């Protein structure tokens, strides 16, 4: 399958790309810097993405997190848009574009999925977060002479 992958500096880009390649999919990078119109229309982004779709003729568009501007172009060009949102709350999911028929918008928060489902929105689905366990298994942890922890508990994220 030919997948256009929106790269915008999100967490997990490398893991997801590696998983797609390992499954034999062809990836086409679409650079999507944070300053581009993620909330509203952005003519430059829309034009670049439309041109890429016409040149590459992909099977699907994929992004980590949901972006209305991408959905808008995918709807226009009749390309399936798959997003996997790991931010919560992700206010971009509440865009009117979420009901576009091109969308398959996965969220890791089951209650958020249920909220959309109960509202009759069928384009949002539930999918837990994932990690590249092979990559994580290669991380070495300092054992001998390691420094004791300064605190009993730390919060990350």
How would you describe each model-predicted region?
Residues 78-157:
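Catalytic core of nucleotide-activated saccharide and alditol-phosphate transferases
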Residues 1-78:
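N-terminal pre-catalytic "stem/leader" segment of glycosyltransferase-like enzymes
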């Amino acid at each position: 399958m030919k997948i256009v992958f929106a790269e915008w500096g999100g967490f997990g880009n490398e893991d997801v790309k590696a998983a797609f390649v390992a499954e034999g999919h062809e990836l086409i990078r679409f650079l999507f810097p944070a300053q581009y119109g993620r909330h509203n229309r952005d003519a430059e982004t829309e034009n670049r993405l439309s041109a890429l779709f016409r040149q590459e003729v992909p099977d699907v568009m994929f992004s980590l997190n949901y972006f209305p501007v991408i959905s808008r172009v995918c709807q226009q060009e009749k390309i399936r848009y798959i997003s996997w949102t790991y931010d919560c709350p992700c206010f971009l999911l509440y865009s009117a574009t979420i009901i576009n028929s091109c969308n398959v918008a996965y969220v890791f928060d089951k209650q958020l999925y249920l909220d959309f489902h109960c509202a009759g929105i069928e384009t949002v689905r539930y999918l837990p977060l994932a990690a590249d366990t092979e990559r994580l298994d290669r991380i070495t942890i300092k054992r001998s002479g390691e420094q004791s922890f300064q605190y009993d508990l730390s919060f990350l994220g």
